[in-house]
């Protein structure tokens, strides 16, 4: 189970007007890290892997300039995969295996 209060993994941010608290990954592998679009799962069913978008502004675009990163809660490791550049469609995480699938102009990848 993921412990959102673990400050080595997450930094809480409370919005000053709404009072809503969000938990942001403490360790960075990219200048911009963002969760998947809400219709796609970003975590494996066993809670081990949390996948997210990485971006390195000003390079790339939302059309084809983002790559993937993953937090491994078992090892505590956060990794960036620069070879995973994908198109506009959100990647898909297989909840059972933790594998991720993405597409770009050259095909569908795993």
Model-derived features with residue positions:
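Ligand-binding pocket scaffold of soluble enzyme catalytic domains
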Residues: 42, 46, 52, 62
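Acidic surface patches and DE-rich sequence motifs
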Residues: 15, 44, 104
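Residue-level detector of high-confidence beta-strand sites
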Residues: 24, 52, 80-81
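Blade-loop segments of beta-propeller domains
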Residues: 32-40, 56-108
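Blade/loop signatures of beta-propeller domains
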Residues: 1-23
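Residue-level signal for well-ordered, solvent-exposed loop/turn and beta-edge residues enriched
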Residues: 20, 48, 76-77
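Surface-exposed loop and turn segments in beta-propeller and other repeat-based domains
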Residues: 23-33
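Conserved core beta-strand positions within WD40 beta-propeller blades
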Residues: 48-49, 99
């Amino acid at each position: 189970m993921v412990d959102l209060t673990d400050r080595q993994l997450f930094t809480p941010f409370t919005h000053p007007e709404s009072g809503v608290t969000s938990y942001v990954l403490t360790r960075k592998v990219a200048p911009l890290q963002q969760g998947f679009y809400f219709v796609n799962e970003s975590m494996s069913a066993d809670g081990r892997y949390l996948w997210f978008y990485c971006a390195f502004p000003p390079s790339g675009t939302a059309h084809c300039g983002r790559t993937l990163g993953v937090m491994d809660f078992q090892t505590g490791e956060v990794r960036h995969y620069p070879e995973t550049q994908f198109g506009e469609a959100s990647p898909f995480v297989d909840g059972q295996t933790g594998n991720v699938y993405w597409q770009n102009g050259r095909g569908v990848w795993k």
